[in-house]
Amino acid sequence: MKILKQIPDFCLSHWLLRIPLAIVFLQQGISKLPFSLDDADSWELPYLVWWFVVYGEIGAGIGLIFSGIMVSKIAGDYIWDFWIQDLGDLLTRFSGIVMCCIVTGVIWISEPASFWDVILYDNLHVFLWVGGLFFALRGSRT
């Protein structure tokens, strides 16, 4: 037990999950720009839904990075206020919820044969969904 107490705490470990998840969502959202009605039609989605998907992916990626900066001491002591931490926590949770909604829609549109097909063969979307769910449930208290 003494050995475990000697291991230093790495309080910035949430960045190891936050950065790759944000990059994937930013990359997917930016790759859809400029979006058009033809893009939405190719996925058989209404234009408004496609608009929310594109800006949701970009916003969730930016929100996840920005909220991490808001709750860390990277931002500096002058904005290290209580309400900034709460706002950062809410932004993290909202970004996670948006990620879960978008990935759920992607899985739904792919029309898998069963739940097990998603779990066994759609690993990327399962990991993106679980990553979004992690931040939605934990917020910035990681």
Model-derived regions: residue spans:
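Extended, low-polarity transmembrane helix blocks
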Residues: 1-34, 38, 48-142
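Short, structured beta-strand/loop micro-motifs enriched in basic residues and often containing a Trp
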Residues: 43-47
